[in-house]
Amino acid sequence: WYLNAPQDPNYVYAAQTSTSQRMQVAIDKATTGARGDLAASLETKIESMTKSFTEEIDGELRESYTQAQKEITSKVLRGTSPKEKKVFQEDNGTWRAYVLMELPVGKAAQEFLSKMNSNEGEMYTRFRSSQAFKEMKEAVDEYEKEQQSGMASQNDSNR
């Protein structure tokens, strides 16, 4: 999984490795690096999903839109979780950690739509009419369906 990250249209993945004389520091460094990679991937994904929309808006709205994107990236990354983690001690005593972080695409889209709706009435109205909105809405719907399915199967197993 480190060299070949999983491919799933509903998730963004990032893998990192790091070393340290202390095991927890190696894990923390690898996790932080993977989150940084997720941030870059998330920003790229949001930018590509909304490129056609940003070309339609003027400079003032573009600035507000960019700020919303940064806030969303920051907020969503706090909810990332490690999918895989491997730690071992190398021959020289140094600890090496491998971490694979995952982020549900729908969660990012959900946060983005929520921020857009609360942030700028005019911008949200214009955004709703764009193809980018339709794509994000589909990602949110898929994420919510997946969350409900997960809760249903968890409830079934608790009975």
For the regions a language model picked out, list residue spans one by one.
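Domain-level marker for long, solvent-exposed, non-transmembrane regions
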Residues: 1-159
